[in-house]
Structure formats: structure tokens, C-alpha cells
């Protein structure tokens, strides 16, 4: 049987590759680059050493930025107000590329390294079923065999291979949008994450003593420039990860509700994601009416939940994106942010579509409603609330 394996080069997928070869299967490995800081040539070399008959490295960084990250920014995507969906966003794209190669190779099955306790199994299986239907079988050895990291390492040693990354305290997943850190001391929700868990951000107390100011330009909701310099979104994200992370901003530590019914302690680094979403939300407040703003928050939450829950194929997502895109037509302008020792504050914003009027809001000059106008407005505005309050007070 020919199996196409979504291969990260880590411990689990390396053990799966050896297991599949032990079972007599031909294995074609696929590594999809979505911005992870990994030596992809080394990953390819490892795949061949472990017995892959063919290896594909797919560069999908630009596509990840332009198709997935851009919409996450427009949707202010923060699952449970914290997690910017880095891993969740990348899985549909990786599954798509793996499915394409499975078709190209006329594979009998595709395999992945997801555990039965995680969200990724839902994301991968759902997308693979969408692209491959029932023609190509989905194999999940970690789930099927309840494969622990210790067992995976033993499989590799038994076959004469050194387990990759076994010395690491943490399980890491990273891409252009975020870096996820799990395991080790982080499994204790009361334990502060040790500094060795972080790679993209410095400790805030060790950040520079002078603040960093940045001006981020947006066009129709999408970041297009930093300090006036136009650049592609992938470059903007990469640059902000480096610049903002150096000032200690971008760390996330929270309890997360997984799709599979478990609560997990999750630690992330996402300097660019948090910066761009904060700037985008501020620009939205500058241009939207109050009703648009409230409605947009509903759209954002629904979109974020669908993506987190592995339902990229859900038709509602496309419907939500049409509304999100329509509202983002007006989110054009510049946002100025100040980053200092682990904090970020928006300190300026401008848009040609701004509803803000300096003249109207000035308390010393300009337009003022008359006393009669104000009294009339307050009377009408408060009618419902006053009537209900009085009626209910009668009944205790």
C-alpha cells in the first residue's frame, strides 16, 4: 500500500514513518512550510534515512499569509479572546497540500501524527475527507496505537535510529503566525512558564529601556506597510515577530477549551499576530458605527470558533467572510503603536473614513446641543428603561 504521510520531521511522524515501513508500506513524505523555523533540507534528509521512497517539500508561506492570515486579521481572530489561531489556521492548508500529493501519487492512504486528545485530528481528518472523499483511507497511528512519546522513541531506537528532539522539554509547533509550547512544567497550570520555553520574545524585564514606535498601514483591513514602507504581508508578519518580540510583547498563557472536551493550559508566542489584531481593531473603532462594531464582533467570534473547531469546510465560514470583507472595505488608514517592556498601546490612528470629528468633540469650541435638544433626547432615550424599572419596582 502506498501511504502519503504529513511529515514534520519530529518524533511522532518519524516513528510513524518507521512503523509504516515495518508494515511493508511504501511511504511518500510531505512537509509543508508555513513559516516554521526548521531546516527543511534536514527534514528531507531524515525522511529518506527513515525509509521514505519520495519526499516533497511544499513552500506555502505566501499562500498562508495571503489567504489565511489576512482573513484572521480582518476577523480579529482570537479564540476565547486569547489564541490567534496559529496552528488552527495552518492545518487546512497543510491538509490541502497533502491531499494534492496523495492524488498525484495515486496513494491508497494518507497518514498524520495527531493524537486523540488534540484538536488537530479533527482539523486534518475533516479537511482530508473533504479533499479525498472515501477514495483514500486516513491513517492515524498515534491515535490508533495510543502512541506515547516514549513508545515513539523506542520504535526508532529498535530500528537503529536516534529519536529527534527527545532531549527537548517541550513540544513545539510553530508557523509564521504563532509559536505553541506544550508539555513539561507547563502541564501544571499554576507553574509560571520558564524562560527557556520562549524563543520569539524576550523577558519583558530584559527588554530595551526605550519604547518602540511603529506605524502600521492598512488597506481594506489588510496590513500593507510598516513605517511607510510597503511590503507583502508575510514580510510584515515576519518583521513584527522580530521587532515586537525583542520588546517582550506577544506572550500568551491561558486555559483553553479544546474541541474534544478537555481543558488545556496553552502557552503561545505571537508578537505580530497580537500587534496586528490590536491595531486592526482600533482602526475598526475609528471607522465603524456602533451598530457595525457590535455586529462585527459577532461575525469575528463565529469565524474564530469555526476555524478553531476544525470546520474550515463549513459553508457558514464563506458567508461570514463575505460580510467581514464588506465591512473591511472601510478599514483603511494608519495606526501608531508603542511597544514597551511587554506591553503594547495604540497611541494614534488616522483614516480617510474616520467618524471622529475633533471640532465636534471639542468642549471649548464648536457645536453644542441646546439644553432643549438634550432634554428631549434623554427623555426619548430612557423611556423603555424607566418604564420597565418603575413597573418592576411595583412588584418588588
Swiss-Prot record:
- Identify the pathway: Amino-acid biosynthesis; L-arginine biosynthesis; L-arginine from L-ornithine and carbamoyl phosphate: step 2/3
* One MF annotation (Gene Ontology) recorded for this entry: argininosuccinate synthase activity
Where does it primarily localize? cytoplasm
**Highest taxon of source:** Archaea
What organism is the protein native to? Hyperthermus butylicus (strain DSM 5456 / JCM 9403 / PLM1-5)
Q: Which InterPro entries match?
A: Arginosuc_syn_C (IPR048268), Arginosuc_syn_N (IPR048267), Arginosuc_synth (IPR001518), Arginosuc_synth_CS (IPR018223), Arginosuc_synth_type_1_subfam (IPR023434), AS_cat/multimer_dom_body (IPR024074), Rossmann-like_a/b/a_fold (IPR014729)
Q: Where in the cell is it found?
A: Cytoplasm
Instruction: Please write the reaction equations for the catalytic activity of this protein.
Output: L-citrulline + L-aspartate + ATP = 2-(N(omega)-L-arginino)succinate + AMP + diphosphate + H(+)
User: Which UniProt keywords are listed?
Assistant: Amino-acid biosynthesis, Arginine biosynthesis, ATP-binding, Cytoplasm, Ligase, Nucleotide-binding
Question: Which family, according to UniProt?
Answer: Belongs to the argininosuccinate synthase family. Type 1 subfamily.
Oligomer status and interactors? Homotetramer.
Residues annotated as binding L-citrulline:
83, 119, 123, 171, 180, 256, 268
**Annotated gene:** argG
What Enzyme Commission number(s) does the record list for this chain?
6.3.4.5
Chain positions recorded as L-aspartate binding sites = 115, 119-120
Q: Which GO terms describe its cellular component?
A: cytoplasm
GO biological processes: argininosuccinate metabolic process; L-arginine biosynthetic process; urea cycle
- State where ATP binds: 6-14, 113
Q: What is this protein called?
A: Argininosuccinate synthase
Report the coiled-coil segments: none
Does the keyword field hold 4Fe-4S? no
Amino acid at each position: 500500500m502506498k501511504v502519503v504521510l504529513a511529515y514534520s520531521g519530529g518524533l511522532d511522524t518519524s516513528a510513524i514513518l518507521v512503523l509504516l515501513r515495518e508494515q511493508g508500506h511504501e511511504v511518500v513524505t510531505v512537509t509543508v512550510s508555513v513559516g516554521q523555523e526548521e531546516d527543511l533540507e534536514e527534514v528531507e534528509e531524515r525522511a529518506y534515512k527513515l525509509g521514505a521512497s519520495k519526499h516533497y517539500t511544499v513552500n506555502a508561506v505566501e499562500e498562508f499569509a495571503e489567504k489565511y492570515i489576512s482573513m484572521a486579521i480582518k476577523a480579529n481572530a482570537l479564540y476565547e479572546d486569547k489564541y490567534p489561531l496559529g496552528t488552527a489556521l495552518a492545518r487546512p492548508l497543510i491538509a490541502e497540500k497533502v491531499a494534492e500529493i496523495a492524488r498525484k501519487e495515486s496513494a491508497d492512504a494518507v497518514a498524520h501524527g495527531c493524537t486523540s486528545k488534540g484538536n488537530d485530528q479533527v482539523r486534518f481528518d475533516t479537511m482530508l475527507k473533504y479533499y479525498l472523499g472515501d477514495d483514500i483511507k486516513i491513517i492515524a497511528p498515534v491515535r490508533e496505537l495510543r502512541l506515547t512519546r516514549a513508545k515513539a522513541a523506542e520504535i526508532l531506537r529498535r530500528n537503529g535510529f536516534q529519536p529527534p528532539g527527545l532531549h527537548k522539554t517541550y513540544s513545539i509547533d510553530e508557523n509564521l503566525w504563532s509559536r505553541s509550547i506544550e508539555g513539561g512544567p507547563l502541564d501544571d497550570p499554576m507553574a509560571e512558564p520558564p524562560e527557556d520555553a520562549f524563543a520569539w520574545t524576550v523577558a519583558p524585564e530584559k527588554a530595551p529601556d526605550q519604547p518602540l514606535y511603529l506605524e502600521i498601514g492598512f488597506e481594506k483591513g489588510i496590513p500593507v506597510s510598516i513605517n511607510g514602507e510597503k511590503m507583502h504581508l508575510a514580510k510584515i508578519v515576519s518583521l513584527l515577530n522580530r521587532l515586537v518580540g525583542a520588546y517582550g510583547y506577544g506572550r500568551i498563557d491561558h486555559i483553553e477549551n479544546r474541541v474534544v472536551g478537555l481543558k488545556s493550559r496553552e502557552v503561545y508566542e505571537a508578537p505580530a499576530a497580537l500587534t496586528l489584531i490590536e491595531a486592526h481593531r482600533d482602526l475598526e473603532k475609528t471607522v465603524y458605527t456602533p451598530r457595525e462594531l457590535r455586529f462585527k464582533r459577532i461575525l469575528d467570534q463565529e469565524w474564530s470558533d469555526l476555524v478553531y473547531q476544525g470546520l474550515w469546510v463549513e459553508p457558514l465560514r464563506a458567508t461570514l467572510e463575505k460580510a467581514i470583507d464588506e465591512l473591511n472595505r472601510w478599514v483603511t488608514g494608519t495606526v501608531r503603536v508603542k511597544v514597551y517592556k511587554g506591553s503594547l498601546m495604540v497611541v494614534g490612528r488616522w483614516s480617510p473614513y474616520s467618524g471622529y470629528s475633533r471640532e465636534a468633540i471639542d468642549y471649548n469650541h464648536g457645536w453644542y446641543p441646546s439644553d432643549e435638544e438634550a432634554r428631549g433626547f434623554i427623555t426619548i432615550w430612557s423611556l423603555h428603561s424607566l418604564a420597565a424599572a418603575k413597573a418592576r419596582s411595583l412588584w418588588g
